[in-house]
């Protein structure tokens, strides 16, 4: 209740601050000196307005659960306002071209990450449509495991699956297993779901594909593909220690089997194989050819498109043959609905657009010079280790995407070990609070 009142007070203060700035005639801003790169805007009223706009947008993002306003909407508008203010002020000082170049640079970074994530999401949706995850859930439910065994199995699977899929998909899958098994046992469900979130976040921290933050670090070229795997032991410890503590809260009982056996649809195993081949292609393009990983991922999308085409052709021949045997009829019904573009359409577009807003907002604030100031305080005065630990703590309060993108934009001069540390803390820091990660939410 106190948190809710505090949020309302903060929101009102930000609105009042923005309104106060808004009544100042903007024409009096433009004639002030603006340094190259936007650094002169740090103490400029337009800089303050940009901060206020970003804070207001992020308050709306944090209140998504209560307002039911999609998180992408406020940050997209905030990004447009911030860059519009910066461009307007810079145009009057002759720096318009520099602003355009900076905006294009941030947009290119977003485009690479968005296309990469889009391919990964398409494959995950295709595997979901082929009932890969349902089959795994069905197998786990009816194996007569006890609650404690299921607690460790679901948590361990979350840790192992999230590096290949992503922590949100993994958490949804494993929590569905827990709900199917635990049902009315709320104690087991709550403890097991916490364990899954911790496992998924920890597992995603040691793989470039496990979380958006690790993908950002890899795409930026700060760490090589294989460097992430040196985080395996620290990530494992981050999972095992909380799991060992939670183990004693799990009831020592056995659930009832209430689920029917579910089989994967035809083509499911080949789609899994194509996804692994796509990952290999992306890594090979980056490591051996020096190309952006997104080109390899989009090539992998072509693999899936061709396979979908062949799958449809095979089913059309089966339908034209008029074979209505029960076994074939089930197969036809399973295969015909598959369509690659419908899988693309079902991607997490709100997340992708939210990511656009965050990248552009943070990029705009970075152009103004606020990130340089933050970098000076955090990495020059506090030291890299302290700063990177603080990044992890911030990730539990604020979404780890803007926090990590801000660090990457600051681009502090750090050793590989420190970059690995901030990658780990940003990934697992979200486990401290339920709102700290997409999996937790």
Predicted regions and their residues:
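N-terminal secretory/membrane targeting signals
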Residues: 1-31
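Hydrophobic alpha-helical transmembrane segments
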Residues: 51, 76-77, 114, 148-156, ...
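Hydrophobic mid-bilayer segments of alpha-helices in multi-pass membrane transport proteins
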Residues: 48-58, 68-93, 110-122, 173, ...
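Interfacial loop-to-helix junctions that mark the boundaries of transmembrane helices
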Residues: 36-47, 67-72, 97-111, 225-234, ...
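Membrane-interfacial helix-loop connectors
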Residues: 34, 82-91, 95, 107-108, ...
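Transmembrane helical segments that form the transport core of multi-pass membrane transport proteins
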Residues: 100, 130-133, 137, 150, ...
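Juxtamembrane and boundary regions of transmembrane helices in multi-pass small-molecule transporters
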Residues: 186-190, 194, 202, 206-207, ...
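Structural signature of hydrophobic alpha-helical transmembrane segments
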Residues: 40-53, 108-119, 162-171, 231-242, ...
């Amino acid at each position: 209740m106190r948190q809710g009142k505090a949020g309302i007070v903060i929101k009102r203060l930000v609105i009042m601050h923005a309104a106060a700035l808004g009544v100042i005639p903007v024409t009096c801003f433009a004639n002030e000196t603006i340094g190259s790169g936007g650094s002169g805007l740090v103490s400029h009223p337009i800089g303050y307005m940009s901060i206020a706009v970003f804070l207001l947008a992020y308050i709306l993002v944090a209140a998504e659960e209560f307002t039911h306003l999609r998180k992408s909407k406020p940050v997209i508008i905030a990004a447009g306002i911030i860059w519009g203010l910066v461009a307007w002020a810079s145009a009057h000082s002759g720096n318009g071209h520099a602003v355009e170049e900076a905006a294009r640079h941030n947009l290119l970074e977003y485009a690479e990450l968005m296309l990469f994530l889009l391919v990964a999401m398409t494959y995950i949706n295709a595997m979901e449509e082929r009932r890969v995850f349902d089959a795994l859930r069905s197998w786990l439910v009816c194996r007569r495991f006890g609650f404690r065994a299921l607690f460790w199995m679901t948590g361990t699977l979350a840790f192992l699956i999230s590096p290949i899929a992503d922590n949100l998909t993994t958490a949804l899958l494993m929590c569905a297993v827990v709900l199917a098994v635990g049902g009315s046992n709320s104690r087991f469900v709550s403890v097991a779901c916490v364990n899954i979130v911790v496992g998924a976040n920890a597992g995603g921290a040691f793989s470039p594909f496990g979380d958006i933050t690790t993908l950002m670090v890899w795409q930026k070229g700060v760490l090589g593909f294989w460097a992430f795997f040196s985080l395996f032991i620290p990530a494992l410890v981050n999972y095992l220690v909380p799991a060992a503590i939670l183990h004693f809260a799990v009831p020592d009982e056995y659930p009832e089997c209430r689920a029917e056996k579910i089989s994967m649809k035809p083509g499911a195993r080949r789609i899994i194989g194509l996804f692994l081949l796509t990952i290999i292609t992306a890594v090979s393009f980056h490591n051996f050819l020096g190309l952006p990983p997104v080109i390899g991922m989009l090539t992998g999308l072509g693999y899936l498109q061709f396979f979908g085409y062949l799958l449809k052709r095979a089913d059309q021949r089966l339908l034209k043959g008029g074979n209505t045997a029960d076994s074939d009829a089930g197969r036809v019904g399973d295969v015909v609905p598959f369509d690659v573009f419908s899988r693309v359409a079902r991607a997490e577009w709100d997340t992708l657009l939210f990511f656009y807003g965050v990248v552009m907002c943070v990029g705009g604030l970075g152009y103004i010079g606020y990130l340089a100031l933050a970098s000076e305080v955090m990495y020059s005065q506090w030291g890299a280790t302290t700063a990177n630990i603080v990044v992890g703590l911030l990730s539990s309060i604020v979404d780890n995407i803007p926090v990590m993108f801000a660090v990457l934009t600051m681009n502090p001069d750090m050793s590989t070990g420190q970059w690995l540390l901030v990658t780990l803390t940003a990934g697992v820091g979200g486990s401290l609070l339920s709102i700290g990660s997409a999996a937790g939410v």
